[in-house]
Amino acid sequence: MTLTIDHVPIARSDLDAATEEFTRVGLEPEYGGTHADGTTHMAVVGFDDGSYLELISGTDPDIEPDLWPAFIDADAGPCAWCISVEDVAATLQRVIDAGVRVDGPQTMARERPDGTRAEWDIGFLGEPGSEKFPFTIADRAPRSYRVSPTESVAGGPLTGIEAVVAVRNLDASVEAFRRLFRLATPARAEIPEFGAAVASFPGDPLMLATPLDDGRGTWLTERLDTYGESPCACLLSTEDIQTADEEYALREPTEWLDRRVAWFDSDELDRALGVVSRSTAAAGR
């Protein structure tokens, strides 16, 4: 099973406010419509590689969202991550055979503002309530019904998404992901500015992060205590972080293993959404 990121949901209590903030930093989303159950709606920032950020919120403050209610209520940002697969049912069977619990398949849908109906199958991996492992998705309708490149990023320097997943035990989590997805041995480093020890899997859009115990990781410990093991950040890949800085509102980059990361210049998005260079050589600024 390969790790091809389909999308990362970003939980916000107010979709209009989230859209305004993303637009301010240069990532203007497009409204995507309401999910079939009517309790959530979303906006999309779609990249050229087909991946996208999904800003998701409840449709009515008096009705609990069916998806990620605790994350949405608290404006928690990244709340899950999704990978594309050819066949959800077949993928879930392989995961069961590997000894991991699953839920699904389920069929979901969303109606776009123009009336187009997108439909897809999804399946969840791992224990109920945990977003440590990705959920899986396969389209029933043409993928373009669900997402296409968004004007604010199409043809630009941002080329895709990498997920940073907060975990409690880095060693055990590395082994679990390597066993399930056949990943290479990760590179590891402590990143003081992020307050975490990070493992990055070469060639795959995944990093695992566990809090440093020197006080700098307090924010990440609190996030784990509140939401459990789940994504804590999204990094948007770029070949040229300097060009990305010219087009989007970014803070000064910092070292990130053998790469560099620049967080978006937003208190709401700090340490939750950034840009990552593909290599040190491409990261000059």
Predicted segments, located by residue:
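Short, solvent-exposed beta-strand-to-loop segments that form ligand-recognition rims
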Residues: 34
